[in-house]
UniProtKB/Swiss-Prot annotation:
Stored InterPro entries: Ribosom_uL1_bac-type (IPR005878), Ribosomal_uL1 (IPR002143), Ribosomal_uL1-like (IPR023674), Ribosomal_uL1/biogenesis (IPR028364), Ribosomal_uL1_3-a/b-sand (IPR016095), Ribosomal_uL1_CS (IPR023673)
GO MF term list: rRNA binding; structural constituent of ribosome; tRNA binding
Alphabetical list of PROSITE patterns matching this protein: RIBOSOMAL_L1 (PS01199)
Keywords: Repressor, Ribonucleoprotein, Ribosomal protein, RNA-binding, rRNA-binding, Translation regulation, tRNA-binding
Gene name, Swiss-Prot/TrEMBL: rplA
Descriptive protein name: Large ribosomal subunit protein uL1
Amino acid sequence: MPKHGKRYREVSKLVSRQELYEPDEAIELLKKTASAKFDETVEVAVKLGVDPRHADQQVRGTVVLPNGTGKTRRVLVFAKGDKAKEAEEAGADFVGAEDLVEKIQGGWLDFDVAIATPDMMGLVGRLGRILGPRGLMPNPKAGTVTMDIARAVKEVKAGKIEFRVDKTAIIHAPIGKASFEASKLKENFQALMDALLRAKPATAKGQYLKSVSLATTMGPGIRVNPLRAVK
């Protein structure tokens, strides 16, 4: 296990490993633990009471964070004709079809989100082995395969994120930067928690939110009382 640096050990003293904090307290404490020389990302980790091995207990979805992520996301759109024009007008960074497929097959991956119109998926499907493992493949469930291209682009630019439970039943999601005001982080946190509740599988039994923690990129985890994580 790697040893943590002096700075990490110092800020860790501020955090009780036993205590379950109120969301407001956790966010205030989190801002005190962020002392790196760059603007650290704030991430939430939620352990869910689901068994991801079962198809009917998969948890995935999207949420538009009201205050954005603090990161400028580069959006690529696979579209032609009027839909390509719509994408450009909505603020997409890259728009194209066969030309973009060839570029990506050549190793170019300088974008954060890919969106496609349904008619383009036959073409985009060739990129499955490249985009799939990186979580970049357009997907109807994530709202990234759609005819409403303008809305999809604008939502991503505004702070839409995708969440998906991993094989250990944990969801990791960014909710902003350490430089955000505490109130804005709280609003983003609440939006994510509400979205997780909406995505609860009907077959999930027992306690759904088993544990919740917050951390900055370089900071210690701060445990949040899961019973208080949702209003």
